[in-house]
Every structure is written in C-alpha cells, then in structure tokens.
Amino acid sequence: MTKDNSEYLIERRDNVYEVVIGLEVHAQVTSNSKLFSSSSTTFGAEPNTQVSLVDAAFPGMLPVINEYCVKQAIKTGIGLRAQINKRSVFDRKNYFYADLPQGYQISQFKYPIVGEGTVILDMAHGQKEVGIERLHLEQDAGKSIHDMDPQNTLVDLNRSGVALMEIVSKPDMRTPDEVSAYIKKLRSIMRYLGTCDGNMQEGSLRADVNISVRIKGSDKLGTRCEIKNVNSIKFMQMAIDYEANRQVDLIEDGKTIDQETRLFDTKKNETRSMRSKEDAHDYRYFPDPDLLPLEVTDEFIEKLKADIPELPDDKKKRFIDEFKVSAYEATILVSDIETAKYFEEVVAKMGKNKDMKLAVNWITGELFAVLNNKNLEISESPVSAKNLAKLINLIKNGTISGKIAKTIFELMIDGDIDPQIIVEEKGLKQESDPKALEALIDKIIDTNREKAIEYKNGKEKLFGFFVGQAMKVSGGKANPQLINEILKKKLQ
C-alpha cells in the first residue's frame, strides 16, 4: 500500500487500485426550533421533553416550515459557492423505523434548495477542489436507545423533526486525508456562517461515507458501499482504510462487491453489512401534499448574501496580504473562527510596533500546547488576547527574553495575570545595559582564559560555551542578542 499526502494506492499482485470517495454530510441547522414545529432543539434535554404533536405525528397535525432554517440553508449554499434554487420541493421519503413516527421522512429529492457548488481544500501537495452535488433540507429522525433496558428498545423523540442540511459531495476525494480536510473545511465554513455548530461529539455533524475502488487510471467507477453515520474524522479515516482494502481483496479473489449499506464497528475497527443499499425508488418519493413548493425571490437571496461574513478563504487571503503571514500560517489561523478572532485581537492590542511572526508563533505554539493539554477551546483560553499581546510586546521591546517569556507565560495561565506585573514582582526584566554585560563577559573570559585562547585558535564551537556561561551567570536575564555581539568583539 502506498500512502502519502497526494495519493492513497492499494497494491495487489499485478494491479494498483485507487479509492473513490464521496460524502453525504448531515449537518444539524443551528436554530432554536425544529424544521416544521416550534419545539426546542436544546441538546441534552430529558428524553421526550421537546416533542410537539407534529414531531410525534399525531393525526391531523400539519407541518409549518421554519423560515429561519430556510435562511440558514441558503446561507450555507452561498458559503459553498453554490447555485441557490429559487424553487424547491419537499418530498416524503417512505420507510419504517421505530424512531420515525410518521412512517416517512420529509426531505427534498428532485428539487433541492441548493444545487452545485465547490469546496477548496488546502492540502500539503497543493489545493484540491471538491464538487458539491447538492444541499437539501430534511427533518431528523428520533433516537433509538438499545442499552438502557435488556428487554426493550427505548425511543427518544427530542431529535425528531430537527432541521438537517444534507450536503452531498461529488466523488472527488481519493484519500482519507482529503476526507479529513473536507470535513474540517465544511465545518469551518458553517461555523463562520453560524449555520451549524459542527459538534460531532453531540451528533450535530455526521457523515455517510461512500467508497468504491478501481484500477488506477480507469475512468469507470466501481460498485460503491455506503458506511452510515460515522461521527468522527478519525473513524472516517479508519473506515475508509478498512473498507477499501476489503473491496480490493474481494476483487483480487474473483468475487463481486455487493452494493450495500455498512456500519463501522469502532471496537473492532472494521465495517460490517447492515442491509442491501436502497435505490431512490425503494423509498417511493413523492411531493408532500401538506407542504407547498418553497419559492424564494432574488431579493430574498441577495439580502442573505449581504449578511454573509468574511469566510475562511477570503480571511486567509487578507491575513496573507495584510499581516504578511505565510499561506501555511494563515490556513491554521483561519481554520477556526475563534482562533482567527483571537489572532486579530492580539494584533490589534500589540499597537504600532507589531511583530506578526512572534504573534503567530506564540498562538500556534505555546498557546495551542496549553489548550491541547487542558482540552480547551481557544474561546476558553486561560490567557486573554490582551495579555498575550502585552507579553509579545515585552519580548519585542527587549524587556524580557524569549526564554524568560516562556516562564512568565506559565505563570500567566493561572488567572490570566498581566505579564508586566509578573516581570516586576519576580524581577525578571532582561539585562540590556551594554556596560553591565561587558563587565559580566570580561569576568567570564578572565575565568576561562584557556578556552578563550582555544576559541581564538580556531575552536569556534566554544562560542556556545561562552554564551551559555553568560546566561547562567545572569540567571537567564542577559539580552541574548547583546551577549552575542559583545562576545564576538571580545573574542576576536
């Protein structure tokens, strides 16, 4: 098997196979109420406490479209550079399951609210474009709970009727890394827009992964299998790896691949068959007679476009142009809207004498390390942007060294303490007086005369020894730049 950032190939005997991947992402719409009822969508509520008569499919109850959910879907479509359809139709998708009280799901089949679009991925080997086939609105089902009662399956209808956007990609992805980048980019766009929170651990973003394999260089698509409801990027990558190899092994053994729906077992790290894959006619789609076609005007769409915030790709370009950061650094900074906000606040608080390199390094290095260690989001950062900017300025103006700054940063974490106060209380101000440093270096050279002679005779590696001695004697407070300059003069 060949794996790198640009290709993912499976080698068997005389054949080399490539993997073809498409995703159907189910994104829960950020909305206070459901798609066709006024019931709350609050996560974590007690079972069956957020269920209206419409959600429970009581006879005679009619759905009423939530305009806000429609706006959220259109905004997402705009963010995906997609065609917004001024006329869309809600259909009934007919199937039976215990947590689907209507006996059908209200979805969109032939006429979705959003058409084709694109998502640009920043990969290590360059940019990759993934096509969007469509985005349609649909209602979520309830939740079946199998592990609370040994004899029965329990049903919680709190989720029933919650608005979902199903975002269907084209089969343009070829590697697990591209799938990871696609999910992250999609989540980032929706978080910028405020249309989906993207919290996979809460189930508000999950995906069906469609996989097929074919001989490298072939244009013909293989038989695809769908892996249902994968709710983490790590599991998606593991599922793709297992399923692709399973399909290749079947082909190499002369067997056929069945078109089917499969489940990823997270304990065994393997996929297993659930049922044969349904085609559209199996669901007997037809327009919902209780809902008129949804029609929106150009004016309605333009008004939503005017409210679209700066999105990741545009923000990345601005960061590169305005702040002179690298494309790689900009990609990291804009990938999460809260990180981008934090960075811009740090830059604003740094004042006129800005050092962008220091700002980027401290945010993506020291701060990210603390957040990862404490399992915190940047919005929960124990160090405010204001105080991090102060710390960076103290380094920039020579008040403290980078080494001392790391010590101060560790102290700042406990209570978001002003770094200037720490410097004053702990006596950590950097020694930058040339005369004082000359006297210190003269003493070090005098104490180590033999090494000074060796250095002058060509043993240049000893320069680091003298720098180390200067930092040791000064308690780490000596200005490293001045130490280097003075030592070079003294040791000539």
UniProtKB/Swiss-Prot annotation:
GO terms for molecular function: asparaginyl-tRNA synthase (glutamine-hydrolyzing) activity; ATP binding; glutaminyl-tRNA synthase (glutamine-hydrolyzing) activity. Signal peptide: none annotated. PROSITE patterns: GATB. Keywords: ATP-binding, Ligase, Nucleotide-binding, Protein biosynthesis. Disulfide bonds: none annotated. One of its GO terms (biological process) is translation. InterPro entries: Asn/Gln-tRNA_amidoTrfase_suB/E, Asn/Gln-tRNA_Trfase_suB/E_cat, Asn/Gln_amidotransferase, Asn/Gln_tRNA_amidoTrase-B-like, GatB, GatB_C_1, GatB_Yqey_C_2, Gln-tRNA_amidoTrfase_suB_CS. Its EC number is 6.3.5.-. PANTHER family: GLUTAMYL-TRNA GLN AMIDOTRANSFERASE SUBUNIT B MITOCHONDRIAL AND PROKARYOTIC PET112-RELATED (PTHR11659), GLUTAMYL-TRNA(GLN) AMIDOTRANSFERASE SUBUNIT B, MITOCHONDRIAL (PTHR11659:SF0). Heterotrimer of A, B and C subunits. Belongs to the GatB/GatE family. GatB subfamily. Allows the formation of correctly charged Asn-tRNA(Asn) or Gln-tRNA(Gln) through the transamidation of misacylated Asp-tRNA(Asn) or Glu-tRNA(Gln) in organisms which lack either or both of asparaginyl-tRNA or glutaminyl-tRNA synthetases. The reaction takes place in the presence of glutamine and ATP through an activated phospho-Asp-tRNA(Asn) or phospho-Glu-tRNA(Gln). This is Aspartyl/glutamyl-tRNA(Asn/Gln) amidotransferase subunit B. It comes from Pelagibacter ubique (strain HTCC1062). The gene is gatB.
